[in-house]
């Protein structure tokens, strides 16, 4: 029997409201697009860019974290909250829509940056660029 032992996420520290996003781009968006964004039901967003709405308007910015850093943080949190022996883990599923790079994949990068926390014989799956359904697909893959 296959058991899902634990799951965790990590999000960037920079938080902004959708209204800020629309406000900073008001002069560049059509009324139809503004209406569509307003009806999505997403009030709060996260970004690795410390000034994301202004960045879209052309102001320079810098990244506050990388997808790999967030993945390592989530992996460490996942193992800590589970509280079990990391050697019992048989599969690492890493999911993102915004990888730092295409290759090596996110799961491989996490394995390399967890400094021996995970077994080198651990199987890995990286799920990238799959849209909103990536969370559900990740759980499905983990239970397969």
Q: What is the predicted role of each segment?
A:
Residues 90-98:
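Short glycine-rich or small-residue beta-strand-to-loop segments that form or flank ligand, phosphate
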Residues 40-47, 65, 97-144:
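Conserved catalytic cysteine-centered active-site region
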Residues 2-90:
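Conserved active-site "lid/cap" helical segment
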């Amino acid at each position: 029997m296959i058991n899902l032992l634990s799951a965790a996420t990590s999000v960037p520290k920079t938080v902004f409201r959708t209204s800020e996003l629309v406000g900073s781009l008001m002069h560049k968006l059509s009324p139809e697009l503004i209406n569509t964004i307003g009806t999505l039901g997403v009030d709060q967003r996260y970004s690795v860019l410390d000034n994301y709405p202004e960045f879209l308007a052309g102001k320079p910015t810098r990244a506050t974290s990388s997808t790999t850093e967030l993945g390592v943080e989530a992996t460490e949190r996942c193992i800590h909250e589970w509280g079990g022996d990391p050697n019992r883990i048989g599969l690492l599923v890493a999911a993102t829509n915004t990888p730092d790079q295409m290759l090596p994949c996110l799961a491989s990068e996490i394995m390399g940056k967890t400094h021996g926390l995970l077994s080198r014989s651990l199987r890995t799956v990286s799920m990238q660029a799959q849209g909103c359904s990536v969370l559900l697909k990740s759980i499905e893959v983990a239970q397969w």
